[in-house]
Amino acid sequence: MDEMNLGPEAQELHDSIVAEIQSGVLKLKDGLPFGTGDETEMQYDVTLRELTAGDMIDAQAAAEKLVMSKEGPVLVSSPSRMGLEMLRRQIASVGCIKGPLSMALIRKLSVDDFQRLSLATEMYDMAVAASLTQERGRVAAVPE
């Protein structure tokens, strides 16, 4: 992604997200409200985590919906719902809010924060995949 020709604003966003991922905490611009009434506090610091096989299975199950067709009941999977389910499970915490976030909390994010979080998780996944690729195929030297 570093090699793409991005406009100045996109490059700045990319660079800030990369730096924040490397530091371990992503900052939301607008924040996520926690609490009710006068006790509501905005939460800004997002900690991400790697998805597990269990997370993937749970996200897939949550993305499926039973619909009736001419031939009878059919399970249909929604790719957009799958993406949201994976996103919410990848969030370890937002401030004092422990993950995975509920869909109700995801809906409370501003558009800017939602897009920032989506980009960050995508970049985080790419970084994890790249590190796995670098490790792959390396064999420790064994004395003979």
Curated annotation (Swiss-Prot):
One record GO biological process: viral tail assembly
Induction: Expressed in the late phase of the viral replicative cycle. Expression of late genes is activated by the viral late transcription activator C.
Main location per the UniProt record: host cell
Location within or outside the cell: Host cytoplasm
InterPro entries: Tail_Gp41-like
Pfam families listed in its UniProt record: Gp41_Mu
Keywords: Host cytoplasm, Late protein, Viral release from host cell, Viral tail assembly
GO cellular component: host cell cytoplasm
Entry's family note: Belongs to the mulikevirus tail assembly protein family.
Chain's role: Required for tail assembly. Together with FS-gp41, may act as a chaperone mediating the interaction between the tape measure protein (TMP) and the tail tube protein (TTP) thereby directing the polymerization of TTP to form a tail of the correct length (Potential).
Name assigned to this protein: Probable tail assembly protein gp41
Highest classification ranks of the organism: Viruses, Duplodnaviria, Heunggongvirae, Uroviricota, Caudoviricetes
